Swiss-Prot record:
Its EC number is 1.8.4.11. The active site is at C14. It is an enzyme of class 1 (oxidoreductase). It holds the Pfam family PMSR. It comes from Bacillus pumilus (strain SAFR-032). This is Peptide methionine sulfoxide reductase MsrA. Has an important function as a repair enzyme for proteins that have been inactivated by oxidation. Catalyzes the reversible oxidation-reduction of methionine sulfoxide in proteins to methionine. The lineage of its organism: Bacteria, Bacillati, Bacillota, Bacilli, Bacillales. The keyword Oxidoreductase applies.
Length: 178
């Protein structure tokens, strides 16, 4: 069994919808909802929602790259978001819901940039890919009630996933490309 562990950090709008797709993959050790990229130390959900802290809702993934490589994480990430929307994601608007790939080292940056370029050239989207690739910043875990929300609140999670427009967007852009 591999002992390797790395971190990947992705902002993709509401973090509730960003946990389940990664949580279900082999080689994923942990998926944690939280906040990153801002200037406030240990912000609360209420503070982040004001769009004054500079933080984005994000997930930090601990993974074994020998089982589930970073390139596969990137592919899965792109399939959870609208990478052409710079104002938030689906029904959630504002800075805290903008997308971003937070890289932890140079190799991740190279892979993220190559993946973004490949997606831009794929023709899947009519508009340019605007998701930023940023240096990893301090990551602050969200409050416990946000962690693994899809397991704790299944009905509300499903209603939100569909009602926000995310589920339909994913279906229309990726259903025949996976």
């Amino acid at each position: 069994m591999s002992e390797k562990q790395e971190l990947a950090t992705f902002a993709g709008g509401c973090f509730w919808c960003m946990v389940k797709p990664f949580d279900e993959q082999p080689g994923i050790i942990k998926v944690e909802s939280g906040y990153t990229g801002g200037h406030t130390v240990n912000p609360t959900y209420e503070e982040v929602c004001t769009n004054t802290t500079g933080h984005r809702e994000a997930v930090q993934i601990t993974f074994d790259p020998d089982i589930f490589p970073y390139e596969k994480l990137l592919e899965l990430y792109w399939q959870q978001i609208d990478p052409t929307d710079d104002g938030g994601q689906f029904g959630d608007r504002g800075e805290s819901y903008r997308t971003g790939i937070y890289v932890h080292h140079d190799e991740q940056r190279k892979l993220a940039e190559a993946s973004k370029e490949k997606l831009n050239e794929s023709g899947i989207f009519q508009k340019p890919i605007v998701t930023e690739i940023l240096d990893a910043a301090p990551f602050y875990p969200a409050e416990e009630y946000h962690q693994h929300y899809y397991k704790k609140n299944k009905i509300h999670y499903e209603r939100y996933h569909v009602g926000s427009g995310r589920a339909g967007f994913i279906e229309s852009h990726w259903s025949d490309k996976s």
